[in-house]
Amino acid sequence: VRITAGPFKHACDLNVKVLLQYDTDRLLAPFLREAGLPKKAETYGNWEKDGLDGHIGGHYLTALAIHYAATGNLECKKRMDYMVSEFARVQQANGDGSICGFPNSKKFAEEIRKGNVGIVWNYWVAWYNMHKTYAGLRDAWLYGKNEKAKKIFLKFCDWGVDVISNLDDRQM
């Protein structure tokens, strides 16, 4: 469905105007940091620096994909494709399929793999945070028609399954 006129088009245009004010490199900074890659910009403050680092990146990717699908806005597509490419670099640098922006995400996954599920209480909603990235990649694939996003998403899913594969029902 393409939105071409009326109040929904006006609302989409306002959304896109706001979306294009964000700096994608600032949104990607937590993911690059966790992958050991040099940041291209400093991360945003507040929640993006206080333990929930990276959660806006997934929301943003979803918004870009939806607005590209609904309006055909090429700047949304360009930014979506850029974020997907950067997530591919992060995933490759991590070497295990993960794409996480929250602090000490590798330690989190190691502890969960060992069955130490109590570690979740030391993190600010880690699974929620990762879900935003999962959803953003899924939306870039399904709505934005980005095939690279599909590959990255599925590899990230495989990583998530691997992290929890040894947990029993009680631990889940």
At which residue positions do the language-model features occur?
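Glycan-recognition and catalytic cores of secretory/periplasmic carbohydrate-active enzymes
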Residues: 1-172
